Amino acid sequence: MSKLWGGRFSKQTDQLVDEFNASIEFDNRLIFYDLLGSQAHVKMLFQQGIIDTTDYKQITEGLDIIWKEAEQDKLEFNLSDEDIHMSIEKRLIELKGEVGKKLHTARSRNDQVAVDMNMFLCDKAIKLVNELLQNMSVIKELSEQHTKTYMPGYTHLQRAQPTTLGHHMLNYFWKFQRDASRLIDFRNRADLSPLGSGAFAGTGFNISRRSTRKDLGFTQQFENSMDAVSSRDLSLEFIFCLSSIMINLSRLAEELILWSTKEFDFIELDDAFATGSSIMPQKKNPDVPELIRGKTGRVVGHLTALATTYKGLPMAYNKDFQEDKEGLFDSLDTVESSLKLTSKILSTMTIKTKNMEKALYQDFSNATDIADYLATQGIPFRDAHAVVGQLVKHCQEHNKLFYQLTEQELDISFKQIADSLEENSQQILTQMDTTKILNIMDPIKCVHNRNSRGAPAPEALQFQLGQAQKYFHSLTEQVKTYQSFLP
């Protein structure tokens, strides 16, 4: 079949070219956005007197038929159509004959695909915010339930300081809150209509870009027609937003994987979100979080691929731009499914609170609190750090933990350690009331002492939960102010 653009060619394109050149297999998901753009465009052509009433009614009727066919999944796509834009135009001509050929008056596929993508990106950004809000809600609820579920906190994957599960989980709330805010910022920035920019230099027809902008629902438009069709920074930014979400999901997935091992034994995944082994009958594998972790590289890879494609292109439009869609669509699908699965995993997993608390009493995670206390008594913190470091060494040599030390052992240890200190610090350490230090050696009491803003003490955590609720409510209300481009 002849191409709609084939007037200056004497040969049909090679079959391999058709296969290589076509994007219809993946850009067909833009069909309703493309139809919206065409409806707004043809209405503007009529309002500006570029087409007459009869043509306008015929074209609009044809576009409505195609919309219904698409809804019923009856529209057929062929490689020879190249892309969704040509496919729709070809179908319109089949339905309405010669009048269908007037649809593309004063328009290029360059501004056509740009407006399709901007509407698509705006709508998907808000959909993703809603998915993030679902995860934030689950995390917030978990945190509220576990303000006093004590556990070790980690640095370098080594037990570091005591905290609570509520405090630990709430850190993900704030990561996702920033991801959601970033998407809303993106939605505002993408609120630009490129329609009417033509191939890149506008058009000589008396069009009204303001009319199509308002009909479609954009609040702004690209001020430069070349910029409108030659830019893919919005696609790039959107994939960055997706990458950030996946990176945060991956870090959460990594912890769920670790916590579900017998070595940690902090959680158990629900059977509905785990798999077995083909050879080892006892296995319960965390395949879902592992795949979330694994798919993160795929999304970040798409970001790198598009940035690399985009970086060296001259103005204005280049066919290379077609490469933005497959990676973007794949990234979007990956993030949407990962967010849905994560909220389900978090809301169904079993939390082994006793094991978490037990782990607190198997290490020296309260060492910092002891050093802090010594500093409050007048010993310079760096000396206090050294004192507690030597105390840890003493305990390890005698196969003991802090809470197992007696008052007498602590007195003897401090006197031995004091010899390495300056005179003032020696005096303070040897006269120290060791009963108070023994009291600090309880990791749970250490948690309650950490009451600075953002810390895990119950009072501080309750305040943070209140702040989280405010941000959650604000985001929820913001999302309601955005309308989908699709009816």
Swiss-Prot record:
Pathway: Amino-acid biosynthesis; L-arginine biosynthesis; L-arginine from L-ornithine and carbamoyl phosphate: step 3/3. Its EC number is 4.3.2.1. Belongs to the lyase 1 family. Argininosuccinate lyase subfamily. Keywords: Amino-acid biosynthesis, Arginine biosynthesis, Cytoplasm, Lyase. This is Argininosuccinate lyase. One of its GO terms (cellular component) is cytosol. The keyword Lyase applies. It holds the Pfam family Lyase_1. It catalyses: 2-(N(omega)-L-arginino)succinate = fumarate + L-arginine. One of its GO terms (biological process) is L-arginine biosynthetic process. The gene is argH.
